[in-house]
Amino acid sequence: MSDMTEIPSPLPGTFYQRPEPDAAPYKSKGDDVAVGEVIGLIEVMKTFIEVKAESAGTFESYLAENAAPVQAGAALARLA
């Protein structure tokens, strides 16, 4: 079994797991994730910044709730 990798928040703000309120989350358990693939959004002062995977793997789970405030460096999601 491979090691788990956590995807950190690039900056403080509000984390969103989905591109729009009524849309499905960017990723679900078992989905493949490629380097540079978007897994969420951080909102800072009404600006949305894409959170991208820095490594490839299999999506395990979101570690931050949807629409939750997060700090820079906080783990947002986990890959296997």
Predicted regions, residues:
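Absolute protein N-terminus
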Residues: 1-2, 80
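Short beta-strand-turn/beta-hairpin segments enriched in glycine/proline and small hydrophobics
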Residues: 2-23, 41-54
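Short histidine-centered loop motifs in beta-beta connectors
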Residues: 17-32, 60-65
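Amphipathic alpha-helical interaction segments
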Residues: 23-24, 34, 56, 70
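Short hydrophobic beta/alpha edge segments that flank linear recognition/processing sites
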Residues: 28-50, 71-80
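PDZ-domain C-terminal substructure recognizer with occasional recognition of PDZ-binding tails
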Residues: 57, 62-76
